[in-house]
Amino acid sequence: RSLGILVFCLLLFGLCGTAFAAEKTKSPYCITVNLTANVVTVYEKDAAGNYTVPIKAFRCSGGTDTPEGTFRTSAKYEWRALYGNVWGQYATRITGPYLFHSVPYFEKDKTTLEYDEFNKLGTTASAGCIRITVRDVKWIYDNCPIGTTVRMYRGDVKEPLQPVAVPK
């Protein structure tokens, strides 16, 4: 068990840790996306200024084409046109065309949510973006400034927090 804790800590530092210490970013948070588990985890800084304290976990849906790597957010959009002639709310650009955004809507209208797509949260289902519930993606939109570090990876790492189940 001690070995498991040690491995977890080493992986955590590799995901958000010392490479992005307090002096290198002004963001209060670092975000990781486990594309295998379909979980977004938000970390805040510890006393030493490293992002090691998990504070939130969200169920998400990534895609088979979602890139792995470390990125910094670069733009935000209350509504954003998405691939496939649909819309997403509270989008935050991760890199290139890849965004955090809500489950898609048929129109730029809160009453047109694609319920079938909502029910896919927790599975690999997007064209590459990271889909999250409106409540959770709005938290990122409101609390994580442009320049926030995002680390996306695939692996069987046990996440430190488990997201609340998404009601179907």
Each predicted region: which residue ranges?
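Exported/periplasmic cell-wall-interacting domains
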Residues: 24, 66, 77-168
